[in-house]
């Protein structure tokens, strides 16, 4: 399963490149299919030496890596922090989240109603 064209990110402010918006199209043949997930991404002062902070805006049930109280993604649980170098990017992070959503153990999780947010 490829994340190609299933993840996107953009900024609303070309002056401040710390804050980004992201979207993930739910993987096909999963409980996430036909859903668009919105995320907020903060590339801190140490980015790209350190990965960004990522938070789901759209409510999602993905307890293997998403804090169910606030939507923050634990990047360590999906292998993003291990081996991170300054050549890695926001695209890599979103791709790793997409692949976590596509894992067999996550494909059938019941999901909150569409349109709900953290």
Residue ranges and their predicted role:
Residues 42-51:
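Proline-anchored loop/turn motifs at beta-strand termini and strand-loop-strand connectors
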Residues 24-28, 43, 60:
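Short, well-ordered turn and helix-capping elements at secondary-structure junctions
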Residues 1-30:
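Start-of-domain signal
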Residues 8-9, 18, 36, 46, ...:
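Intrinsically disordered, low-complexity N-terminal regions enriched in serine/proline/glycine
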Residues 1, 23, 36, 51-118:
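Domain-scale recognition of soluble eukaryotic interaction modules
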Residues 28-30, 45, 79-84:
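A generic structural motif
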């Amino acid at each position: 399963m490829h994340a190609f064209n299933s993840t996107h990110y953009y900024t609303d402010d070309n002056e401040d490149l710390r804050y980004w918006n992201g979207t993930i199209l739910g993987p096909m043949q999963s409980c996430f299919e036909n859903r668009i997930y919105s995320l907020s991404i903060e590339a801190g002062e140490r980015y790209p030496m350190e990965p960004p902070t990522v938070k789901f805006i759209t409510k999602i049930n993905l307890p293997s890596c998403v804090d169910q109280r606030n939507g923050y993604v634990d990047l360590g649980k999906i292998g993003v922090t291990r081996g991170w170098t300054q050549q890695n990017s926001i695209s890599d992070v979103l791709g790793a989240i997409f692949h976590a959503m596509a894992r067999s153990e996550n494909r059938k999780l019941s999901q909150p109603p569409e349109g709900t947010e953290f």
